[in-house]
Amino acid sequence: MASFDEAPPGNPKAGEKIFRTKCAQCHTVEKGAGHKQGPNLNGLFGRQSGTTPGYSYSAANKSMAVNWEEKTLYDYLLNPKKYIPGTKMVFPGLKKPQDRADLIAYLKEGTA
């Protein structure tokens, strides 16, 4: 598995397309929007896992105490259930390093 340090540069436009097709069914990035099946991702970077107000997280997600940054998201998005065993997230992950880098680039812009 390539580490985030070896990840290709991300393209936010490509990442937005990935978000719309693979993430938007369960998540939003819109400030002030309610939660969907998954939590609102606005303000994601620098936040600890399991701490978004108003969302009911799994015990595993709360106790893992991951600080969401580019590196942790890169690893998490490869295989969420392996990274946080017991997570409620059903998404199987993004296997391609470029897809993960693109999605993270979009999230950096879209959740700020």
From Swiss-Prot:
Residues the record lists as N-acetylalanine modifications: 2
PTM description: Binds 1 heme c group covalently per subunit.
Amino-acid positions noted as binding heme c in the UniProt annotation, renumbered to this chain: 23, 26-27, 89
PROSITE patterns, alphabetized: CYTC
Keyword NAD: no
GO molecular function, one term: heme binding
Protein function: Electron carrier protein. The oxidized form of the cytochrome c heme group can accept an electron from the heme group of the cytochrome c1 subunit of cytochrome reductase. Cytochrome c then transfers this electron to the cytochrome oxidase complex, the final protein carrier in the mitochondrial electron-transport chain.
Record has 4Fe-4S as a keyword: no
Disulfide bond positions: none
Family: Belongs to the cytochrome c family.
Protein name per its UniProtKB record: Cytochrome c-2
Signal peptide interval: none
Broad class of the protein's primary localization: mitochondrion
GO cellular component: cytosol; mitochondrial intermembrane space
Keywords attached to this entry: Acetylation, Electron transport, Heme, Iron, Metal-binding, Mitochondrion, Respiratory chain, Transport
Subcellular location: Mitochondrion intermembrane space
GO BP term, example: gibberellic acid homeostasis
